Amino acid sequence: MNGVKKLIGLGLLAGFFNVCVYASFDQREDVLQWLDEADSLGFTKAEVVNYLAQTTAKPSIVPILRNAPERKLLWSGYQQRLVTSSRIKRGIEFAAEHTDQLNLMAKTTGVDGAIIAAIAGIESNYGANMGQHLTLRVLVTLSFDYPRRSQFFQRQLAEFFRLCFSQGLDPMLVKGSAAGAVGMGQFIPTSYRDFAVDGDGDERIDLFHSKADNIASIANYLARHNWQKGAPWL
């Protein structure tokens, strides 16, 4: 009988922890406190709560982030993995298609067009792989279930909501990397805010669809970080 009681007790305890661990984000105190303290997110508080209610944790994203190739591999291994013949071919085609803008960026920012093209290739294979993770799910998980970097990702989450609001995007549909980066150049939300620029003259910054905006934004990012032409990059 005592054994049965212990099993029942353990079952109830396990159930309690499951409720705590898997509580909906819109019901968690830490999430609601963040929401209360966050500056305007564009969307109303009720809208944000609704998005959070539809978002589930993605625990697998933490080991993916921790074991990212750029964190684990030496340059030789990283180069072997990313600098492939197919990617080089794409790079040649990309540079040919966007020669005029790459040359313009080199002239106006000092960043070599070949460097801009190379970064677009490394980051997303020239837009072919801009990430398949739901960005809201990633950022919410990393904001509240990854304590070591929670403050950083909470800033990204807030900026992600502002970005979606300003561009008319559905936060539930946006996809990106395991770190919440989006677009051909893989900009995290705060970098999107600070460094993304309009490259095609349509008075709109769109790193999800405009290659011209991505080219200009990559160049601007490097220029704003004091890119020095001819300096060693490795």
Residue map of PLM features:
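Cell-wall glycan-active module
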Residues: 1-154, 159-175, 180, 190-234
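Functionally critical loop-and-helix segments that line ligand-binding/catalytic clefts
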Residues: 186
